[in-house]
């Protein structure tokens, strides 16, 4: 069964603003930079624009810090807090550029939990069409201990079994009930305890999975 862990911030609930003097980078959906400028006046945005037409690195960081700090306190308190073996996590981003932003911020946020301030090389990776051999990446995410967090758009949304997956995180909203069911369904695959421990050594069993909802995707009809 799925359990929902909801993360709310000021921006996701009430919107925010790009302040006068802030640097703005405009990109295409694929992440190609088309324009960069410094704002001369305040630009307000509402919650519905966040992570759609507006990507806020500060907002992503707050979500990732909340997630990090909840793993071994709220979600998996019975596990030994080994940061190199956090539960396998799949994050859904809105597009390729958003996915890249998330990967970079995950690296920074989780690095704080490692002694030398560096996360393992394969700890978080992007699985999108721009990321190279996606079939190999999906296989490695399924079987390798070092690969803990995958960030994707829709590539891993359907037809992909990652049985050790224990967290599905939504950093984008979904308005299709069929797609939403397929996306959250990535987490519901069962796995025997010995197989789980092969890739997540501090786990004992998979009796549920978590939907980490950063955008309210669990709270509205599709």
Regions found by a protein language model. Give the residues of each.
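Conserved RecA-like ASCE P-loop NTPase motor core of nucleic-acid helicases/translocases
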Residues: 85-95
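Short helix/loop capping segments that flank catalytic or ligand/cofactor-binding pockets
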Residues: 2, 12-17, 100-101, 179, ...
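Structural motif corresponding to the C-terminal cap of alpha-helices
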Residues: 67-78, 110, 141-154
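Short helix/loop segment immediately N-terminal to the Walker
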Residues: 70-87, 115-119, 195-202
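Conserved helicase motor "Helicase C" RecA-like lobe of SF1/SF2 P-loop NTPases
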Residues: 73, 93-126
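Short, well-ordered amphipathic alpha-helices
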Residues: 63-73, 100-111, 184-194
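Conserved RecA-like P-loop NTPase helicase motor core
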Residues: 123-221
